[in-house]
Each structure stands twice: as C-alpha cells, then as structure tokens.
Amino acid sequence: MNNLCADIGYKSLNHFGEELCGDHIDVIEQDENSIVIVLADGLGSGVKASILSTLTSKIISTMVSQGLSIEDCVETIAATLPVCSVRGVAYSTFTLLRIVNNEEAEMIQYDNPMIIILRDGKNYEYPSTEMNIGGKKIYKSRIKLQENDIFIAMSDGCIHAGVGMALNFGWKREDIIEFMETFYDVGFTAKTLSTILDRKSVV
C-alpha cells in the first residue's frame, strides 16, 4: 500500500444536432483504494448509441467490480449486443481502466484509441498483450503506478475531430499526445485536463 490516490475527471460532447451523447463513462469504487472506470462508445450517435454505450459500460463495470474475468465480461457483451449487419462491427467499443490498491493499473481496450499515459512529462509507451475473445481483438496491459501519472482515455470522437474541416485527417493520436504533454507540469485537475481536451476537439 502507498499514499497515492486517483483524481478522476471526464467530459462528454454530443454529436452535432443530438440531444444525447453516444459515449458513456462509469466509475465504480471497488474499495477505498481500487476503482474501475469504463468508457464505452456506442455505434453511431444519438439515442441508440447512448443506450448501447450505457448498457456496455454498466455490464463491464459491474462484472469487473464483482471480480469476474474480462473473458466473462466480453462474452456477456458479445451475447448481449449484436453486430451491425451493414458494417460488420460491434455496436459498442470500450476502454476499461482499473486502479488496484493505488499501486497498479490494469487496462483492457477494445476498438477505442489506445489509452495515453503521460509519465514525467512525456508519453509513456506501455506493453500490451493481444487477446482474441469471441472473435474480438482485445488489448490487455498492467503497469506499476508512479506519482503524477496521467491516463487519458478517449473514444474515436477525439481522433476524428475536424475531419475534412479544420483538420483534413482528423486529430492524430500523436498530436493529442504532444498537445496534452504541454499541460503535464501545470498541476491541473483531471476534470480541467478533460475539459481542455474536450474544447480543443471542437475548435
């Protein structure tokens, strides 16, 4: 055990013209020092995407917080959410971040942009293991935490920001990393950092 604690903040941005966001975030405290955070992104936008992402995040966060394996979680999601008949892709993607005893971080990622970790002011390249569960390519990582580590999880709404307009090819992950590195030493809260990223996505 150590004296570290997690500061969590997030922002959601509705698709233009939609009343509901297609992304959903769930945060569940397993105990005083362990937290499960799930970001799910429903296919499309609006009401349908919101329902799908909410269902996905609720299922995963609840199952993981109860100690069930990621294999069980993914199999349940696969059985619950159908695959789009037109695109042939799952109706919802997800990113799971679990803080264990404020000492380790476990990441499970499916079809969202990979989590960005900033450590000592720079991007930290962490190892990941590829798994195939129910035909889905899942990436699993586990790292030791250090003080002032910053984890940035996002849906593809960030990397598609400005496509064909302000940014011809969207906002690339490496450009997001470079942008967020500039705020590392400022001491902003997680909520402020997520707001900065959110606002930059719509500029």
What are these regions (language model features)?
Residues 18-32, 125-163:
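Acidic loop->beta-strand submotif enriched in PP2C/PPM serine/threonine phosphatases
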Residues 38, 109, 151-153:
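Residue-level marker for buried hydrophobic side chains located in beta-strands
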